């Protein structure tokens, strides 16, 4: 059985290499997928317009999936305009064009922002899972924002029980352990050392069946491998809600 990679950032045309960023084209990614036995990769979107980084917008990802539907599907994204009333219609258009989810959602607003809650409400109605990147603070790094202990995420999980939330990034996975830091710099780092029972991520997984995990990148990798015994138990317990993925190659 072929596997699915749930988190890729690709381009349609070649992108010049830089010292800090390498973006593969969808054709360049195929050997990697084949080597790992991956039948289909799901593309993350940077938004409705072309992002400052050379990663696929909704339009570009739709174009890639149309060019090679055997190997690629795509998630859509929205640009923040602060108007919740437009969200459902904009996401409906994306779904009509073939989007299978929303991601990577990285609007740098708190999770209780009305626009974001409109996204989550529409996602549940349209059956579009949401992959989010989390930041520790508005104006710091990128991603949706929550406080230490993830109280806003829990409120979203309660408020939108029919929406599937896929957690991703350092600020989410650092909460695997009960001794998760509270300062913004440390919350944006990979976790390390033995996991102390009572972490918020395991607690939220236990309480809310609509929470899922995106295991791409070192953020999730460290969360699982920092304490092998705990990580293996977590993988086994939530095997049907954890998704292996690449992020960028």
Regions inferred by a protein language model and the residue ranges of each:
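Active-site gating/metal-coordination segments in enzymes
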Residues: 52-148
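Conserved, mostly hydrophobic/aromatic
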Residues: 7, 33, 94, 102, ...
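Catalytic pocket-lining loop regions of alpha/beta-barrel enzymes
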Residues: 100-101, 116-244
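An N-terminally biased module of ancient metal coordination in phosphate/nucleic-acid-related enzymes
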Residues: 1-59
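N-terminal cationic-hydrophobic initiation segments that often serve targeting/anchoring roles
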Residues: 33, 65-69, 95, 157-158, ...
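Active-site-proximal loop/turn and secondary-structure-junction residues that shape catalytic pockets
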Residues: 10, 47-48, 80, 108, ...
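Active-site-adjacent loop/helix micro-motif of nuclease/hydrolase catalytic cores
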Residues: 15, 112, 223-225
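Active-site neighborhood of phospho(di)ester-bond hydrolases with catalytic His/Asp-centered motifs
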Residues: 3-6, 42-45, 75-77, 103, ...
């Amino acid at each position: 059985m072929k596997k699915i990679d749930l988190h890729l950032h690709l381009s349609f045309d070649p992108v010049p290499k830089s010292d800090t960023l390498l973006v593969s084209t969808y054709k360049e990614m195929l050997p990697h997928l084949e080597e790992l036995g991956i039948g289909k990769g799901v593309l993350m979107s940077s938004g409705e317009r072309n992002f400052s980084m050379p990663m696929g917008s909704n339009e570009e990802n739709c174009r890639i999936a149309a060019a090679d539907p055997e190997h690629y599907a795509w998630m859509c994204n929205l640009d923040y305009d602060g108007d919740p009333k437009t969200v459902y219609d904009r996401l409906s258009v994306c779904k009509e064009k073939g989007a299978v989810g929303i991601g990577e959602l990285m609007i740098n607003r708190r999770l209780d922002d009305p626009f974001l809650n409109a996204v989550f409400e529409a996602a549940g109605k349209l059956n579009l899972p949401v992959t989010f990147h989390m930041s520790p603070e508005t104006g710091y790094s990128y991603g949706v924002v929550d406080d230490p202990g993830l109280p806003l995420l829990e409120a979203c999980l309660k408020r939108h029980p029919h929406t599937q939330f896929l957690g991703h990034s350092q600020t989410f996975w650092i909460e695997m352990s009960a001794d998760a830091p509270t300062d913004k710099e440390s919350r944006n780092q990979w976790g390390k050392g033995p996991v102390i029972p009572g972490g918020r991520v395991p607690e939220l997984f236990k309480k809310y069946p609509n929470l899922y995990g995106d295991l791409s990148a070192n953020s999730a990798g460290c969360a699982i491998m920092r304490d092998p015994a705990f990580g293996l138990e977590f993988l086994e317990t939530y095997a049907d809600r954890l998704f292996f993925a690449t992020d960028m190659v």
